[in-house]
């Protein structure tokens, strides 16, 4: 009988694995079992949210104005400066996978944050020292001058810059997934409403950090110097560490569970080894670890990647088999979930490529516009990125207070709309951000070249505003989606995939810039300037590049619709809701004996 027969048999039984619930696993900072009256809850989460706001404030002040520093102070060409910034931010997000791995496997989220918080502070201090000491920078020079050749930073000067950025990237990257997972761990997984509210609150803290960074801290960098600005980032990060440590006695901590990659590898090896076997209809032939635990977690059968089901088939006549030849149902399900979310993850890469433009070319776009509000007051171009966060400071509470309860009544979903619907809404809106950017850049360029008039910097506000709204949907939806689909042993790692999407988006931006320059150069070899090949945006065709991104984003939205439907059609997509219902039934005494239940994979 084949795998389909096994799934049909499973449909007639209630299915459980032997994994403990997260509530049973959590301990305090001394390793003792948590007490609901003392540990976790909103009080503990507030300390984590404070750390989130301070850390975002520190890294955003550096990342969002970094292109100005490397262009004006390090004298890198504009395209190289843009690529350095996108590569830096991409590396920050890519290293989130390392942070998630170390947390889930060895350190736990709290210890991981303590270690890498110190590393990030050291990077900010090194940046401040370089910006302060003239001997660590090339001679001052006006990069916009057409008659002077500015000396680009090289040797030990460039090495100092790269070392500082690597420290910041390593620290911030390894922190990001753990902030979210550690904060979410302060609530019980069955409490979907509080979890959803936490994710919205985390984005609110993120927005507050961004807003202060893009206004106050960027103003400090502009008027007091980059050395003072980087020093302030170090001080702000230190304040965040104080907030994190202050909540130590209140935290629920999930202990590390050992290497998360070994069980995944075991599933593939076992499935390949037993590739010629046929799945039996008798569920007793499927391996489950023996356990005396009362709390169990349900798994729904997935018809996707059915070849992996063979990894948990018992071989007749063998009492004991190697874990590389026989895996548990939970292991197989965990691998299926990991493979199933990859297409959703991939569909958000273009979205983050658009974000990269708002932190690089759009800042330079603002530098080519009239930044004066009054005769004496100017807006730093990097502060333009604060516009969406000013709006979101008001939108996020309104979304949580009014939209979610209304949508909850209409849809029956505890989050108002499902995470997949929330992601799709954001992807749809992101296209219009690039449409607005292209239209404004075309008008800005024509006004300067034909009339010698500089448009007001407020003309580029719509592209930031629209993308800010789209990010409220996609970013929060993606974090909530990955966290809810993760197994208890992979919470930080799977949450890190959210940030890995940012990483790939920024790396793709660098590839697109280089490719577009080469393809659009007059002879195709890159020896003559392409759309983005000059240091002067009035000579470049940034508007064409924005139209290209708008087209890619529009196509990507329909690609996402296909994959989200593919994912939602599988019964295992309701895994988290089933888990919650089962745990509630256990607590109410509705399930008396889980040892007689049949497994489902």
Swiss-Prot record:
Give the subcellular location. Answer: Membrane
Q: List the disulfide bonds.
A: none
Topology in the membrane? Multi-pass membrane protein
Which positions does the record annotate as the modified residue Phosphothreonine?
112
**Sequence intervals crossing the membrane:** 44-64, 82-102, 113-133, 160-180, 198-218, 228-248, 337-357, 386-406, 420-440, 453-473, 493-513, 544-564
List the record's Gene Ontology CC terms alphabetically.
membrane
Expression sites by tissue = Expressed in shoots, roots and stems.
Q: Which InterPro entries match?
A: MFS_trans_sf, POT_fam
Q: Write one Pfam family the protein is assigned to.
A: PTR2
Which superkingdom heads the taxonomic lineage of this protein's source?
A: Eukaryota
Molecular function per GO: transmembrane transporter activity
Q: Keyword annotations for this protein?
A: Membrane, Phosphoprotein, Transmembrane, Transmembrane helix, Transport
Q: Which PANTHER family match?
A: OLIGOPEPTIDE TRANSPORTER-RELATED
Full protein name: Protein NRT1/ PTR FAMILY 4.4
Q: Which organism is it from?
A: Arabidopsis thaliana
């Amino acid at each position: 009988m084949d795998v389909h027969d096994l799934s049909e048999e499973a449909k007639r039984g209630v299915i459980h694995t032997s994994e403990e619930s997260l509530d049973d696993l959590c301990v305090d900072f001394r390793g003792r079992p948590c007490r609901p009256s003392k540990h976790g809850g909103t009080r503990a989460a507030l300390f984590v949210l404070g750390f989130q706001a301070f850390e975002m404030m520190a890294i955003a002040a550096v990342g969002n104005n970094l292109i100005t520093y490397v262009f004006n102070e390090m004298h890198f060409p504009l395209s190289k400066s843009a690529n350095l910034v996108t590569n830096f931010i991409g590396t920050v997000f890519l290293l989130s996978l390392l942070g998630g791995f170390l947390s889930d496997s060895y350190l736990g989220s709290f210890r991981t944050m303590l270690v890498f918080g110190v590393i990030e502070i050291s990077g900010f201090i090194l940046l401040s020292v370089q910006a302060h000491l003239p001997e660590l920078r090339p001679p001052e020079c006006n990069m916009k001058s057409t008659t002077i050749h500015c000396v680009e930073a090289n040797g030990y000067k460039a090495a100092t810059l790269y070392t500082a950025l690597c420290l910041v990237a390593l620290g911030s990257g390894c922190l990001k997934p753990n902030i979210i997972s550690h904060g979410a761990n302060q609530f019980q997984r069955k409490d979907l409403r509080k979890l959803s509210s936490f994710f919205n609150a985390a984005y609110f803290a993120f927005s507050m950090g961004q807003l202060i960074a893009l206004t106050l801290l960027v103003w400090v960098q502009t008027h007091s110097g980059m050395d003072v600005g980087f020093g302030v980032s170090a001080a702000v990060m230190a304040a965040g560490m104080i907030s994190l440590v202050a909540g130590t006695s209140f935290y629920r901590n999930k202990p590390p569970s050992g290497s998360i990659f070994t069980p995944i590898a075991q599933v593939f090896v076992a499935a390949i080894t037993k590739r010629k076997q046929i799945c039996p209809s008798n569920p007793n032939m499927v391996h489950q670890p023996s356990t005396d635990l009362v709390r169990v977690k349900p798994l729904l059968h997935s018809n996707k990647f059915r070849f992996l089901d063979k990894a948990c088939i018992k071989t007749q006549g063998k009492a004991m088999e190697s874990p590389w030849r026989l895996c548990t149902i939970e292991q197989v399900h965990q691998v299926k979930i990991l493979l199933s979310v990859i297409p959703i993850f991939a569909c958000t890469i273009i979205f983050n490529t658009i974000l990269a433009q708002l932190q690089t070319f759009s800042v330079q776009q603002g530098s080519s516009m009239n930044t004066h509000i009054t005769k004496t007051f100017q807006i730093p171009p990097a502060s333009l990125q604060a516009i969406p966060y000013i709006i979101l400071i008001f939108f996020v509470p309104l979304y949580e207070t009014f939209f979610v309860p209304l949508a909850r009544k209409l849809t029956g979903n505890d989050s108002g709309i499902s995470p997949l619907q929330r992601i799709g809404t954001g992807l749809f809106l992101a296209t219009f951000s690039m449409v607005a950017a292209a239209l404004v850049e075309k008008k800005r360029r024509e006004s300067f070249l034909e009339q010698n008039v500089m448009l007001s910097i407020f003309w580029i506000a719509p592209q930031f505003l629209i993308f800010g709204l789209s990010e409220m949907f996609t970013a929060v939806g993606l974090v909530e989606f990955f966290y809810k689909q993760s197994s208890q042993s992979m919470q930080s790692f799977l949450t890190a995939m959210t940030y890995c999407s940012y990483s790939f988006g920024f790396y793709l931006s660098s590839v697109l810039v280089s490719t577009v320059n080469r393809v659009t150069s007059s002879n195709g070899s890159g020896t003559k300037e392409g759309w983005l090949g000059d240091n002067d945006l009035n000579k470049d065709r940034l508007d064409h590049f924005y139209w290209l991104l708008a087209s890619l984003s529009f196509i990507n939205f329909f690609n996402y619709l296909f994959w989200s439907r593919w994912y939602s059609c599988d019964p295992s997509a309701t895994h988290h809701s089933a888990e919650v219902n089962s745990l509630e039934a256990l607590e109410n005494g509705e399930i008396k004996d889980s040892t007689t239940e049949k497994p489902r994979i």
